[in-house]
């Protein structure tokens, strides 16, 4: 955030053509591409945070297309039962709930690495492990737009599925 920008032409050209004043952050900063355009999959406050995120992402991916993703033995019991699942989803179908609570209850060690967290928030995509195996997760988020899919969330989901299938 505040150190990286993406745009075709800078603020000076925008000002000379449209007479609008805009700074680099507003034109193509982390918030613009992480929340609005969806060009950025991740944003980080600092470079060290970014490196931690990159390492986490790579822990779910194979070294190449001929190898399986890394297997990491989970610390939790694969036969575990969790009463939270009985309480997360409300009895009334019109009441929203947070799908992240469901995901984090089901996946190994409650560890879910969300991709495009701030973009098209009515759809959740990310990586986790089940039984030590890396999986991609796509889930509607009832807390945002009642989980209804729109163009942005559909593109987000399709893009993530293609990435997982590569």
What are the language-model segments listed below?
Residues 16-21, 38-45, 88-97, 142-149:
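Short, exposed beta-strand "edge-strand" segments with a Pro/Gly-rich flavor and a Y/T-containing core
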Residues 2-4, 74-75, 132-133:
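Short hydrophobic/aromatic-rich motifs at helix boundaries and adjacent loops
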Residues 29-31, 73-75, 166:
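Short C-terminal domain-edge/linker segments immediately following a structured domain
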């Amino acid at each position: 955030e505040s150190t990286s920008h993406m745009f075709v032409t800078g603020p000076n050209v925008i000002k000379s053509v449209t007479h609008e004043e805009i700074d680099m952050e507003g034109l193509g900063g982390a918030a613009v591409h992480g929340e609005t355009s969806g060009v950025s999959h991740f944003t980080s406050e600092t470079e060290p945070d970014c490196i931690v995120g990159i390492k986490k992402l790579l822990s779910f991916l194979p070294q190449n297309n001929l190898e399986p993703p890394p297997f990491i033995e989970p610390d939790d019991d694969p036969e575990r039962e969790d009463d939270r699942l009985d309480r997360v989803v409300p009895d009334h179908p019109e009441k929203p709930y947070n799908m992240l609570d469901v995901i984090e209850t089901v996946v190994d060690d409650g560890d879910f690495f969300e991709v495009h967290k701030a973009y098209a928030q009515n759809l959740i995509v990310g990586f986790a492990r089940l039984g030590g195996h890396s999986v991609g997760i796509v889930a509607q988020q009832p807390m945002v737009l009642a989980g209804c899919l729109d163009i942005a969330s559909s593109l987000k989901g399709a893009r993530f599925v293609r990435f997982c299938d590569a």
